[in-house]
């Protein structure tokens, strides 16, 4: 088997001409490991780490390493990272450290963070901190430094390094600071203080940043929820525009057994039927979790009526109909919306019907109707058809739908720049 980093990267990024990760997971759930094994050896990247992981669980680590070897030999970072993850899980951290160090020394832009975190997880946090310290001005590496500082016993040094950034005022975000602005620095400093048990200081830091930063507002809500600060969380949720604080409040109330309080928190976002679509989505999930499927359907039907063109809302509604064993009612609702929109549906909307058709009329009818759609032979339609077929246990057909008869030879994919190797 010959594989090429450029070809692998293109197919993995675009999910084109390959078996996607969702289908690989589905194949394994259904027990079709032989299909995953076969295609792992045929250049199907998403099959390879899944099969290698299974082999490792069966104490066949040498065989697992052989599965990944052709991909690893290309120098493709995704393969290096996957191999390091498996080696660490098998108790072979030294080998994992060695392969990530090689990519770091070669200058791969993602390798330093991965290598440092790997060191820290395996008793070498001091070394990781030292590696990261010169890169404090780079956001992802600063976050990694804060994370490894605790095990390195250098929390105060990390706090001092991050504090120096809290005075920065952006003049041309993100170019003036590469995304590492004052609010982000406050969030990182709050992470250190919370870890040290100085929760009130962490809250004060996030409050200072939350007036101008959505991220800090979300961090504040999550922090309050983690520490059970219910009344402060209520106050934060009352002025929350992103619904994130409301979600944290509802989650805390549900965790404490106050389901009605959690429902009320979502319903207060704009009115009795939760017209904010994100609050409605979370409310519907909450109701469904507690056996109130009809109420969940009512919530999402209101959303579908007012925002009929939003495919994620219709998809959520359709899944609720499926969960309630009412595929026919779901199709009737979609039919009514289609008529209101002129009777034509692009594939993104039409594909929502397929699981409902399959549940009511069988997978063959769903596939036939899908192929009759003007976009039914497209590559993106193939993903949906494959999911239907795999769900019915027809794995060979599912794979055949996805894979082109003649895959491009390594090195001949002309799309985009070559990945960093």
Pin down the residues of each PLM region:
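Alpha-solenoid helical repeat scaffolds
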Residues: 37-41, 69, 101, 133, ...
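Residue at a conserved register position within TPR or TPR-like alpha-solenoid repeats
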Residues: 27, 39, 55, 87, ...
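Generic helix N-cap/helix-start motif at coil->alpha-helix transitions
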Residues: 12-20, 42-49, 74-81, 106-113, ...
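N-terminal alpha-helical scaffold/docking segments in eukaryotic complex subunits
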Residues: 1-64, 415
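Conserved small-residue packing positions in alpha-helical repeats and bundles
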Residues: 12, 23-24, 36, 52, ...
